A protein has these predicted regions:
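Hydrophobic beta-strand segments of well-ordered beta-sheets in folded domains
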Residues: 44-52, 100, 233-239
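ATP-binding/phosphotransfer module of carbohydrate and carboxylate kinases, centering on a glycine-rich
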Residues: 3-5, 188-259
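Glycine/small-residue-rich interface belts in oligomeric ring/scaffold proteins
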Residues: 22-60
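Nucleotide/phosphate-binding catalytic cleft detector across ATP-hydrolyzing
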Residues: 1-4, 9, 30-31, 53-141, ...
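Alpha-helical scaffold segments in soluble metabolic enzymes
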Residues: 88, 92, 129-137, 183-187, ...
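Glycine-rich phosphate-binding loop plus the immediately following alpha-helix
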Residues: 111-141, 158-211
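A glycine- and small-aliphatic-rich helix-loop capping segment at beta-alpha/alpha-beta transitions
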Residues: 19, 64-71, 157-163, 167, ...
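Gly/Thr-rich phosphate-binding beta-strand-loop-beta motif of the actin/hexokinase/Hsp70
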Residues: 1-22, 139-164
Length: 259
């Protein structure tokens, strides 16, 4: 049995190749033990684990977890709330003795179009898992936009990651988004931290409810349209909790079908 572990914004998700799956909130995952994987099948039957952890920004190749420095991240501080659940899961897997590998994020050290490297980070590793799934339907050239608490979009062309827009540089999600002038002023004045500004830049904090989904749809569509400049014929896929609600509007904005 093989298991994949996704370190998401709000939860950690666990899935096995037998079709079983479960998730834990990041808070609940602070109490994780390897025995929790019994929900997927006998622990002694696990032949290998692939996991994502945080930004994955200090390595560029799929790597055994016991070979990583600092769990594969430059620092656990940065854009997003640190809770400790993902750290606990990573450490429990590493200490279990079960063969395990980690998926890297996409960042300045990655082999992407150099023009995307104006920003230090492009996408966290779990988005590569989404892209892999999309490739089974759309082939080797496509754009995928993952829309939920934040919005991250990436371009795959001829089976290669060309680049991505991370959560803190372009389209907002429900909770997170880019820092605008007002946020920068508050940070400079010491009213909030930059991380607090990022985690409260989403539409739920700044717009009436009736405008929230249309706003995310427009900005996510703009991310997809921007990436289309580099691959005009790329198909477009949506992922994340908001995808079903926004698909029709995004398709209308782009004037092309999305899946």
């Amino acid at each position: 049995m093989y298991i994949g572990i996704d370190h998401g914004t709000t939860s950690l998700r666990f899935a096995a190749d037998n079709g079983k799956r479960f998730k834990m909130s990041r808070e609940a995952a602070k109490e994780f033990t390897i025995e929790n994987l019994q929900k997927l099948g006998p622990v002694e039957d696990i032949a290998g684990i692939a996991l994502c952890y945080s930004m994955g920004d200090n390595f560029t190749q799929i790597t055994p977890v016991d070979k990583l420095k600092n769990r594969g991240v430059i620092t656990r501080d940065g854009a997003g709330e640190h809770i400790g659940g993902g750290t606990r899961v990573f450490d429990a897997v590493r200490e279990s003795g079960i063969p395990a590998i980690a998926i890297p994020g996409i960042h300045r050290g990655s082999d992407t179009d150099p023009r995307f490297k104006i920003y230090s980070h492009q996408t966290s590793p779990e988005k590569l898992g989404i892209a892999y799934l999309v490739s089974e339907t759309l082939g080797d050239t496509f754009i995928v936009s993952d829309i939920s608490s934040n919005t991250v979009s990436l371009l795959i062309a001829n089976g290669k990651v060309i680049g991505a827009f991370d959560a803190c540089v372009f389209a907002p999600g429900t909770r997170h988004g880019a820092l605008d002038v007002d946020a920068i002023r508050k940070v400079d004045a010491g009213e909030i931290t930059a991380n607090e500004a990022f985690t409260t830049a989403g539409v739920m904090y700044h717009l009436e409810e009736k405008y929230q989904n249309p706003t995310v749809a427009m900005w996510a569509a703009m991310e997809c349209a921007s990436l289309s400049l580099l691959a005009p014929d790329a198909s477009i896929a949506l992922a994340g909790s908001l995808a079903p609600e926004l698909a029709e509007e995004i398709s209308a904005l782009l004037q092309k079908p999305v899946i």
